[in-house]
Amino acid sequence: MPACSVTDIRSHVVEDSLPDQVIKGLKSSPKTLPALLFYSNEGLDHWNHHVSQPDFYPRHQEVDILKQRGDEMARAIAPNSVILDLGSANLEKVVHLLKALEAQGKDVTYFALDISAPQLEVTLNEIPTSEFRHVRFAGLHGTFEDGLRWISETPHICDLPHCVLLLGLTIGNFSRASAATFLGNIASQALRGASKDQSSILMSLDSCKVPTQILRAYTSNGVEPFALQSLTFAKTLLRGPMLHNDSDEPLPCYLQPDDWYYHSEWNFVLGRHEASLIPRYRDVHLGSLLQDITVKKDEKIRFGCSYKYDDMERHQLFLDAGVEQDVAWTNEGCDVVIYELKKRSNTEKLGIDRN
């Protein structure tokens, strides 16, 4: 099989707006950093090391479900489907589903979407293409929004059956209101067209709200280097568009990893894990490159949240997004569940749990 092709579907270069995003986030309350800062190759290496640790239950549970239930999931995907993987950091999980599709002789095309071109290349190079005859592979370089526009507007794609993969607990990275909006947007753009009745979303959610289990997971080995690498990457990216003052000297930017702690906490009220960076010793003055913003000692710069969903919150999410559960796959003792979602019909039907 020939090498996997990659199509650049970006509507704009995301990095161009990064300086404004960083400054806006650092001026907000609470202070935040944009997710793009964590997409360096080094950062992703640290992340993959972190999520492979024994205490990081979300990944292990999701992989086990795909291993044990992949054949059932594959049967739910229509022949000739376009499978769009939103954020395909690596293939360790989804390869079990793809192998099940191959074993069933289903002709489908898997599109790996990633905002990072280098990471996308790594992902595609990991695919053992010689093992597949029925499953074809390609890459899409762009954002979530670019991917949804592509699947809904591309002439030879829009009327085929669609299966959108939203794994890795990605939906948990959004606030509950934003998650419903995003999921509804996926449904409105991907679950339409001539084959809409054969189209679906496969999405994972985590129901764990045990603080000790969550904090062990999100403080396991590798997470602190992952968080701190974002500061080094930020300086590299920021000094492109905002490099010099009138004297042609580089503008100062004080984002030294040694000056910061990684901070992990469970928010009982909002039902989410929160990840932040906090000054280690004293107030940190970020320099003129970042408009002389000061971060007070013990002040948090939040860079990530992971919302957990109990039954009521999950039901509300699906209701607000205009989708309904068709099937749910999990294993005994698991907090993670993978749901097959369809666009909501006028009459809501009951989901079937396969435990």
Swiss-Prot record:
User: What enzyme class is recorded for this protein?
Assistant: transferase
Record note on quaternary structure: Homodimer.
Any GO MF annotation of the entry: methyltransferase activity
Q: Report the protein's function.
A: 4-dimethylallyltryptophan N-methyltransferase; part of the gene cluster that mediates the biosynthesis of fungal ergot alkaloid. DmaW catalyzes the first step of ergot alkaloid biosynthesis by condensing dimethylallyl diphosphate (DMAP) and tryptophan to form 4-dimethylallyl-L-tryptophan. The second step is catalyzed by the methyltransferase easF that methylates 4-dimethylallyl-L-tryptophan in the presence of S-adenosyl-L-methionine, resulting in the formation of 4-dimethylallyl-L-abrine.
Protein family: Belongs to the methyltransferase superfamily.
Q: Pathway, according to UniProt?
A: Alkaloid biosynthesis; ergot alkaloid biosynthesis
Presence of the UniProt keyword Ribosomal protein in the record: no
Record's catalysed reaction(s): 4-(3-methylbut-2-enyl)-L-tryptophan + S-adenosyl-L-methionine = 4-(3-methylbut-2-enyl)-L-abrine + S-adenosyl-L-homocysteine + H(+)
Keyword terms of this UniProt record? Alkaloid metabolism, Methyltransferase, S-adenosyl-L-methionine, Transferase
Top-rank taxon of the source lineage equals Eukaryota
Can you supply a Gene Ontology BP term from the record? methylation
Question: What is this protein's name?
Answer: 4-dimethylallyltryptophan N-methyltransferase easF
Specify whether S-adenosyl-L-methionine is a keyword of the entry. Answer: yes
Listed EC numbers: 2.1.1.261
Q: Per its UniProt record, what Pfam families does this chain match?
A: Methyltransf_33 (PF10017)
